[in-house]
């Protein structure tokens, strides 16, 4: 029998404050060389942002966050990234360099 995990509510504070980032791919290559899609979903409004990229690394994710989230909606206080956990520290370092 499979163990059932307990659900935990996510506290919400203000609009565009908490984002979740996921990576879609490896997809068929596009004419521009893109093979992945970075997708961000805001927890409260469920607003979505997405961008096709050629590779997934700390630079591409931090550029996506800076250009598509921070410039449009302001700084967030919470960021949830599942698959690319090895990039989290470098992503945050790159974002803080931009400020």
Predicted features by range, described:
Residues 1-99:
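Retroviral integrase
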């Amino acid at each position: 029998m499979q163990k059932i995990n307990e659900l935990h509510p996510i506290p919400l504070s203000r609009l565009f404050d908490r984002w979740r980032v996921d990576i879609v791919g490896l997809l068929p290559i596009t004419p521009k060389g893109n093979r992945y899609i970075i997708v961000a979903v805001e927890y409260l409004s469920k607003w979505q942002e997405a961008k096709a990229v050629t590779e997934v690394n700390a630079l591409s994710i931090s550029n996506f966050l800076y250009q598509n989230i921070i410039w449009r909606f302001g700084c967030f206080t919470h960021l949830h990234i599942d698959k690319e956990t090895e990039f989290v520290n470098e992503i945050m370092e790159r974002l803080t360099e931009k400020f």
